[in-house]
């Protein structure tokens, strides 16, 4: 697809070629060109600059007067493919039940797993397609999608095959992750498994097929006191080393049990959640190459603390933002709202939030060579805003979709 965007009010997210991620004070710079143009050739960004340098050619042209253009959002942590909804649990929480109490009573992840077990791949894809179309309308161009609601080999592979089928149908880029350790199901307990032995079983049973069918690019586990502890994490680390699939770990959502330190030492690509942080965990992340992915919409929905964005940024950590889109703890995938929450609740600046939701999100998926910033040769995954005053307005005014159109691979969606 070839296209030229002209008269862009501001073109934002321009970072030097080869920039993998942004950390520290660099995160606070979202470079822009005012009154700009951008050309797309064969689905890639081929040129951009001020309108005074705009080439005269035969490319189809779109006038972006009074509109801003920036990279499409990269949501590096989601559970987009699931069955059914869980609003009944929302009602229970409003009456005082905690996330852990609902899970102990067979709700939560186990509830979703029961619904997945009775759903076909086609049904899972159909439900997820509706959600994905809404996300694209709100500006998401790339998103990681985890399994984890199967809880046995058959249904985990079903979810991963559904993610693959959805990716084949969509212009968005979906990045599949095998969430091998999400909750300990009743059948595993009946067979005498604990969190560690179940994790090893799931890895041993699923990884050969995952590799044969190219069903996942990352491994994940829910490392928490009442879910999967450090012995389970060690099995994930070993499997990552043997399979070549990098680690992305849920950790420190409710308790700090040392998972961050262990994941960083093992070279995990990202550690996600981080609502509860100790000095030891912060020290482990300081200056490391493991990306700290914060999920403010989960904190909002569950009423738990927000991740310490300012501390992480000031400690030279690479910070990304993502939605955690899932039916239980974050039933929404609008990255504009995530950016607003990051500013209002975690005191990130709009520039920091936009970088964390684009380039650093891409880095958390090993995709920053293709996605997340304006650079020649990158995929033409772009947002065109409505006629809003500034790019910062995306993070300021919430509750309204400020995206006029999303361009993916050079094609307007």
PLM segments and residue spans:
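Metal-coordinating catalytic core of metallo-dependent amide/deamination hydrolases
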Residues: 112-127, 133, 141-257
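Active-site-adjacent C-terminal substructures of enzyme catalytic domains
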Residues: 246-247, 256-370, 385-387, 391-392, ...
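Active-site metal-binding motif and surrounding structural segment of the metallo-beta-lactamase
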Residues: 3, 51-71, 75
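Non-catalytic positions within long, well-ordered alpha-helices that form the structural scaffold/packing
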Residues: 136, 203, 211-212, 241, ...
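Metal-associated gating/positioning segment near the N- to mid-region
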Residues: 64-127
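Divalent metal-coordination and catalytic microenvironments
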Residues: 8, 38, 43, 66, ...
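Short peripheral tails and domain-boundary helices/loops at the edges of structured domains
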Residues: 401-413
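N-terminal metal-binding scaffold of metallo-dependent hydrolase/deaminase domains
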Residues: 1-54, 411
């Amino acid at each position: 697809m070839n296209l030229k965007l002209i008269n862009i009010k501001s073109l934002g997210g321009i970072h030097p070629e080869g920039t993998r991620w942004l950390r520290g004070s660099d995160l606070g710079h979202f470079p822009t060109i005012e009154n700009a143009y951008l050309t797309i050739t064969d689905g890639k960004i081929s040129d951009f600059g001020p309108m005074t340098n705009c080439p005269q050619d035969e490319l189809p042209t779109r006038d972006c007067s009074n509109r801003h253009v920036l990279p499409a959002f990269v949501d590096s942590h989601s559970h987009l493919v699931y069955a059914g909804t869980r609003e009944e649990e929302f009602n229970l929480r409003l009456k005082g039940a905690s996330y852990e109490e609902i899970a102990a009573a067979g709700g939560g992840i186990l509830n979703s797993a029961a619904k997945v077990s009775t759903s076909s791949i086609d049904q899972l894809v159909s439900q997820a397609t509706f959600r994905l179309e809404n996300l694209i309308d709100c500006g998401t161009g790339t998103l990681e999608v985890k399994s984890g609601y199967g809880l046995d080999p058959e249904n985990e592979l079903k979810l991963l095959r559904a993610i693959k089928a959805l990716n084949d149908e969509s212009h968005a880029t979906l990045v599949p992750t095998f969430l091998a350790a999400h909750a300990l199901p009743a059948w595993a307990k009946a067979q005498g498994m604990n969190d560690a032995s179940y994790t090893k079983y799931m890895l041993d049973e699923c990884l050969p097929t995952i590799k044969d069918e190219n069903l996942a690019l990352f491994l994940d586990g829910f490392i928490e006191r009442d879910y999967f502890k450090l012995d389970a994490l060690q099995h994930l680390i070993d499997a990552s080393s043997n399979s070549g699939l990098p680690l992305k770990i849920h950790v420190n959502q409710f308790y700090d049990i040392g998972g961050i330190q262990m994941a960083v030492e093992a070279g995990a690509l990202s550690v996600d959640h981080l609502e509860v942080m100790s000095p030891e965990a912060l020290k482990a992340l300081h200056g490391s190459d493991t990306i700290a992915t914060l999920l403010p919409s989960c904190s909002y929905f569950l009423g738990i603390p927000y991740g310490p964005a300012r501390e992480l940024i000031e400690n030279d950590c690479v910070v990304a933002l993502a939605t955690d889109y899932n039916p239980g703890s974050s039933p929404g995938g609008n990255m504009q709202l995530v950016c607003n929450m990051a500013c209002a609740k975690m005191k990130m600046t709009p520039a920091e939030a936009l970088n964390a939701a684009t380039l650093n999100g891409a880095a958390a998926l090993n995709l920053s060579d293709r996605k997340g910033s304006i650079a020649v040769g990158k995929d033409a995954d772009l947002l065109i805003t409505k006629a809003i005053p500034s790019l910062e307005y995306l993070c300021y005014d919430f509750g309204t979709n400020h995206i006029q159109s999303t361009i993916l691979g050079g094609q307007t969606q």
